[in-house]
A protein has these predicted regions:
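Short, small-residue-biased leader/transition segments that mark boundaries at the very start
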Residues: 1-8
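Generic signature of intrinsically disordered, low-complexity, basic-rich segments
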Residues: 8-9, 27
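Alpha-helical interaction segments
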Residues: 9-10, 153
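Sequence-pattern detector for short linear motifs
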Residues: 5, 13, 75-77
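Acidic, Ala/Val/Gly-enriched low-complexity intrinsically disordered segments
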Residues: 12-18
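PLP-dependent amino-acid enzyme catalytic core
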Residues: 19-176
Length: 176
């Protein structure tokens, strides 16, 4: 696991009794080194309109300038970079209504890994087509994200794919 550190070993328990991993500055530095040269360097931009509306100095970070149009490429790319050769060889599966789907598809293509993305049937066509253009096998299923996520989990179990959770993963979050 390249750049992984001990992120899965440092865990705490939240109010619901669920375990979650604490991320450290070293984890973020490891992710940054993997992502260097992959993602666009997006600088903060002062927003006059939002500053006026809130009475504060507001700055925005234009992550829409990333190759996939969203910050989700950061987490997906970093997560896939930490997978073992065996996990990559099994192929990937995820569920998403758009931005995570494109991030996984792009990162998988860059790593030479096959990816299947399950998307709700209500996903905007531009996101479906972009995900396909990045090389993923897209399956449209269900009207809402939960339907797509259920099928993706079933495919991971039945086909042995490595499941890339769209948000509940400390490695993915470290990259984002």
């Amino acid at each position: 696991s390249r750049g992984l550190g001990d992120v899965y070993k440092r865990q705490a328990v939240n109010e619901e009794g669920e375990r979650w991993s604490m991320m450290t500055l070293e984890d973020f530095k490891a992710a940054r080194s993997v992502l260097a040269g992959v993602i666009a360097d997006t600088h903060l931009v002062h927003s006059v309109a939002f500053s006026k509306a809130t009475g504060n100095h507001v700055y925005i970070k234009p992550e829409n300038m990333q190759v996939t149009g969203a910050y989700k490429i950061r987490g997906a790319y970093y997560k896939i970079s930490t997978l073992s050769d065996e996990e990559k060889a099994r192929g990937l599966v995820t569920a998403s209504a758009g931005n995570h789907a494109q991030g996984v598809a792009y990162a998988a293509q860059a790593a030479g890994v096959k990816a299947t993305v399950v998307m709700p049937t209500t996903t905007p066509l531009v996101k479906v087509n972009n995900t396909k253009d990045y090389g993923a096998n897209v399956i449209l299923h269900g009207a809402v994200f939960d339907d797509a996520a259920e099928l993706a989990s079933q495919l991971a179990e039945a086909e042995g794919y490595t499941y890339i959770h769209p948000f509940n993963d400390p490695i993915l979050a470290t990259g984002q």
